[in-house]
Amino acid sequence: MQGATGVTMPYQGTLDDQVAAGLLHQRIIVLGAEVDDQVANRLCGQLLLLSAEDPRQDISLYINSPGGSVSAGLAIYDTMRLIPNDVSTLAMGLAGSMGQFLLSAGSRGKRFSLPHAQILMHQGSAGFGGTAADVEIYAGQLERVGTLLVRLIAEHTGQPVEKVEQDSRRDRWFTAKEALTYGLIDHVLERVDDVRPAGARRMVGVRA
């Protein structure tokens, strides 16, 4: 495959690494795990790399994740907003919590779901202890972050902030069609070409 420098490099690493490298060559990034700092660092790096390689072509983010760290997810979100490229998103299997947030944060008109994907929206929560002062500080931070996420989801879905806040107080599950109606996505995917980046390149040595 060719890297951002145009130098042809042989595949190395495990089969999973080879698949990830092949998809990255097609401008496809996969979020297929819980969102943590390590996953966020990898995805942010991939977004920045693909943007540097071509700042005009779309990048696709495929999501099958139960969610995870809010700070890690916001790092991915901010990187998606930072780069000039449109980032299309696709829900596969499960887009839960932070996975749902990143799904709805895709470029308008380019947010997709497979027909039987499940999408979960809820407010973040965490167990914490310590002194009364520590608990109060942490609770205040959790409330501020929760308010931020609700505002951003409302912005990306077109729903009133009050409705998003109310709907996310408890687990709110969506089918693909329900997510479409709510504004979390723009299309239920029928053809792979609908979500494949226009700048995707055919891999040398890989048969169709």
Locate each region found by the language model:
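N-terminal organellar transit peptides
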Residues: 1-98, 105-208
